[in-house]
Amino acid sequence: MLTVEEIKTFIDNDAASSKKSLAKVGVRYYEGEHDIKDYRVFYVDSNGELKEDKHKSNIKICHPFFTENVDQTVQYVLSSKDGFFKSDIPELQAELDAYFNDNEDFDSELADVLTGSLVKGFEHMYAYKNADDRTAFQCADSLGVVEVEARFASDKKDHILYWYVDKVDKDGKKIKRIQAWDSKETYFYRQEEDGKIELDPFEPINPKPHTIYKKGKEDVTYYESFGFIPFIRLDSCKKQHSTLRPIKALIDDYDLMSCGLSNNIQDANEVLYVVKGFEGDNLDELQYNTKTKKMVGVGDDGDVEIRTVDIPYQARQTKLELDEKNIYRFGMALNTSGLKDTNATTNLAIKAAYSLLDLKANKIEKRLKQFLRKLLKIVLAEINEINGTDYQQKDVYFAFDREIPTNEQENAQIELTDAQRKQTEITTLLNIATHLDNETLMQLICEQLDIDYNDIKDKLPEPDENTPYKAQSTIDAIMTEEESEDNSGGDVIE
């Protein structure tokens, strides 16, 4: 086991690492807390000293492009309605549905893990046994997960330290819970504020095996261990960078341009009064009369001119539009403002708009599949143990059937055209039916209706060979006999 001193050192070093610092920036931007919040306005006074201007407008508005980018990507990648775990073995598919595809808890946790991975650059999920004695999974905030390699530990074993702030007591002190995991058991610790780390006195079993349970009404407690540390990490990329990295500067520039324009409008929102021939006592009286009575007295040759200030907004507006375009481009997201909500928006235009998001989703899927394989390994081992089977990883594959919105009117027109084409082809076949045998005719009709002929051929009636042809031949024969009788001998009427 790790010593208390080791645990404190590992947690402190991890919190100060550049990796976690960058991850915290991603979290801050995802929550809409941008650098513009710290923006300050300064000026140089008459003595040449730099001072903060607290009277000038300093509007601070955050534009959460990153939040939209992440949520949009997560929902698109996980948009498949039938789940991702697939198998051609019906019994195995039923088990996979129970663990993953039809499990709302797993869907929610997987969405949280993928969100955390995109926001921070990496996120963890850990396995545990639920009340039904089945393996379940839960997202673990990676900011509180510390990976300890065996070479750095005193016991030469791999460890995972998982900490979180449990609550704040009545005195306002934060109570931190710390879990030290190894391949067999978990130690539980407690820390108040930055005080001493000590074993948690409220845990009845400490250390605790990964799983403890009882059989029926027995008073005996049994325990099991996974045999490995049940924490699995999902990385956004090889370097574990947040997806904020390529667009952070653009978002900051957009915030600055937008807030700068707001400040200009705020500072120049009132008109200037140019008063000529003023005979009042003082300017305060003039200001009061202007704002309240909407009138002012001037001399015989006096006059009042109202002047406004033109705000140079065109340059800022152009820069805002350029920044927004580049945020979506380099963030590889869908800019819905480029899609007009009209019937003229074709499926081809929609697909083109989704091209960058589709490319990003393809990259994410590769790492997501590797991650899901690790979860599958745990579940397959449990399924085989319970059912006495020998299912392998090769028996399972992943299918990400992402959904892209389409133009419903265009789809309806395509379906109508296709139906008309099929109707024309079937009519043509019926017109030449007298020249085809019944089996060939039915095969051609089934092809047009997307029906498997082999599935229905045994259900078809047993017609005489080429019935339409025989019927036509019979009719021709009757007509021939009648003509012969008409042309045979008889009385001639003159």
How would you name each of these model-derived features?
Residues L283-V296, A315, L322-E494:
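C-terminal helix-loop subdomains that flank or include functional centers
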Residues L118-K120, H124-S236:
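Extended, regular secondary-structure scaffolds
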Residues S18, N103-L110, S117-H124, H241, ...:
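Short secondary-structure junctions and interdomain/linker hinges
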Residues Y30, F42, K54-N58, C62, ...:
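Conserved aromatic-histidine-acidic binding/catalytic patches
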Residues H210-A349:
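Extended, charged amphipathic alpha-helical segments
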Residues D88, L92-E95, D102, F106-L110, ...:
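Short amphipathic alpha-helical segments
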Residues Y126, W181, V275, A399-D401:
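Residues in well-ordered beta-strands of folded domains
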Residues M1-S142, V492-I493:
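Extended, helix-rich architectural segments
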